[in-house]
Swiss-Prot record:
Record carries keyword Cytoplasm: yes
Organism: Corynebacterium glutamicum (strain ATCC 13032 / DSM 20300 / JCM 1318 / BCRC 11384 / CCUG 27702 / LMG 3730 / NBRC 12168 / NCIMB 10025 / NRRL B-2784 / 534)
Entry superkingdom: Bacteria
Transmembrane segments: none
GO biological process entries: ribosomal small subunit assembly; translation
Main location: cytoplasm
Protein name as catalogued: Ribosome maturation factor RimP
Keywords: Cytoplasm, Ribosome biogenesis
GO cellular component: cytosol
Role this protein plays: Required for maturation of 30S ribosomal subunits.
Lineage, top ranks: Bacteria, Bacillati, Actinomycetota, Actinomycetes, Mycobacteriales
Family the UniProt entry places it in: Belongs to the RimP family.
Intracellular or extracellular location(s): Cytoplasm
A Pfam cross-reference name: DUF150_C
Gene transcribed to yield this protein: rimP
Tagged with keyword Cytoplasm: yes
Amino acid sequence: MAFPTTEILSALIEPLAASHKFDLEGLKVTKAGPKSAVAIKVDSDSRPDLDQLEVFSQEIGELFDAAEQRGELNFGAGYTLEVSTPGVDNPLTLPRHWRRNRGRLVALDQDGKKRVARIGALNDAETHVVLIERNKKLLEVTTLELAHSPRAVVEIEFAKPAQDETALAESTFDEATA
């Protein structure tokens, strides 16, 4: 049997991830003999901590070992298993990414034009998100249709956000757009 593909591993990992209330955000398989690696990225609305990731990693290792013993997987000379969460440089591509980063700054890059806004609430259908931008002393509220979202990445912020921005980001979609 050949080294397992991402599709085969995803089919094994996703039910276990779901049992931990994790979403499988990324899976990368690198075949390089004894230096082969399987890198798994998971996330959840409650942000997995290191202890949860350790337990999940152990269970994935046991799952892979059992599948190898049954002849369903073959990692060959071995592999390194890496389990982590997506970093802040991970693009926001799905509604859950926007929901999980509510209140944070996001850098949007559309047609070479960059802008920075604070992420607010999503509408009930999770098709639009509120964006809050400061224009001098005024706050401007716009909505972004997620289906046509430009490249968006969370911005690291060192200063505490202004109270009026935070309050607007915490308001509901309908309140913010009224």
